[in-house]
């Protein structure tokens, strides 16, 4: 019994002694962070070089208090938009940082490949970068469209503004290959060949960079022959929990409406075209006079089937924070967009084109040990697209092709009217042909660990990353036909018949797995000479 008590006391002393030694090995310093105008800087990160376990952030008054290991003599202060500053400190004396604005961004870290970061001032490759704060200024449902005009060397062509289909075709420094000209998309250091960049929430993006020269091929191989688009999402920082809520409402309008001739002018030109072909005029002088003075009905089909404006709403909630052990950022977003095409809901379905998009992003960084840390990135996007059975291209063609002299678009009792030689009237294409419900899901998950081998030689580390990407696309179609009636001299006669809905479904799923492992060496000698290499 006596031996057991002695053993237990030894164990207790061992653990308490370890904590006492740890406490004795730590010191506490305090200070303040200001800019050139002597204004306090909130959220500045202060840490001990090469020892991320000892890190803190400044408060709204620019003040900070932090623990430091025994023997440390230097601390470094960083904040976006300012040059990094390293200072030597003395115990029991406040540390006063005065940060200088970094207009040229020389101390900005660029993520050039596989989570490897380089200081902008030291990177020699051809690269262009835009910060996420600039991208959120453009209220666009498609993320790729927000890059237009913001990155030198990036050519973007947008051929449609249809909700959920307004992505741009992008080229970096023109057309480069006969096998394909699409640049490689890299999301947080992981190549993402299946990733639909158009669905990305701009509120989650820290920066976007493009690699434009041979350096891209050296880093990513033949897949980067047309350049690389590097997307870096936001991460949590040390400090108190921050909650940001963003809401915006925007209006989408056509930049220019088509100029359409009047019904009377159309009738005259139609007759002239028939005469030029040796035919018989279609409209009498009496009808032309009626179309001209308005006694006979005429239509501007663009004005009939197109709304003046369409709305888009975006909602976003962002929660971030962290400490020396765990840093986190969680973002949830919702987007709703309507279409300019005017559709009518019926008893069986709603053919109106609408986009519902849900985005969830969660980035977590964990320091497991002084020499070991890990991260987990999760990005999920869900698109729900509801629209009529026919695409917007067919509808717009029908609007432009349908003669303004055709009555309608429906009779008083709801019958669809068309011309004798127009089998698919615009009203029927929009409201009576059926529907499609499309669901798209993008999932990107990455997990990685970094082992600092500084205890062997300063600046040496090894890292391993596994990335998983999955893409699902499924569509439910409900197709039908409908009765339509063409006007002739004696009244209306029916063509086609109304059919019940016929349902069908298509679905496909793809996935991509990426493994990365490399050794990194980064060290500064003499305060001036830097060596950075990885395999």
Model-identified regions with their sequence ranges:
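Flexible loop and strand-edge segments within Gram-negative outer membrane beta-barrel domains
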Residues: 254-256, 295-333, 337-340, 351-425, ...
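Predominantly soluble domains enriched in secretory-pathway, periplasmic, or organellar proteins
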Residues: 13
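Short, small/polar-rich motifs associated with maturation and membrane association
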Residues: 2-8, 18-361, 374
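Small-side-chain secondary-structure face that scaffolds active or pore-lining regions
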Residues: 335-357, 387-389, 440-442, 454-535
